[in-house]
Curated annotation (Swiss-Prot):
It comes from the Viruses. Residues 37-74, 81-100, 117-168 are annotated as: Disordered. This is Uncharacterized protein R297. Signal peptide: none annotated.
Amino acid sequence: MTSLNTNVEHRRTRTTISQIIHDMTPENKFYITVADGGSKRFRNKPNDQSRHSGQYQPRNLSGKTNISTQSQFTPRLYGKQYNYNQPNRLQTRSVRPNYYSGYRYNNRTGNQEFYPMQPFNNQSFNNQSRTHQSKTYQHNQQKRSFNGPRNNGPQNNVPRFFQREETN
């Protein structure tokens, strides 16, 4: 083991109590530096070097601002739980891939919030994440439905002899 580097001289360590007390007097005080074994996982700044560089955001994005409803009981589909847009010094992918890019009416790229449930009343439904991207994917009942004709008017999807006859 190398000797302790004191301000007075380089000498072999004599570990007697009187020697330690002598070294801790202010004129010959020595300084011991301990190697930093602090874990790099638990830093206060965002963890932008790991692969999973999402910073946890426990905010309640459901729009129901109820004090008793804590954010841990908020369902997962109302907003992002992690922020995947951290800068990444390693060249790994720091943005979660867009799982909903194949749908119709969705021409946006990047992270999507996605509301898979249809509301009972489409007119009074407003998207909760107005600030992020206003309407990502939603069946618009005013547009044509996905398969088949419009669902108002005559029954176009039944054979012709089942349709109502016009009264002359």
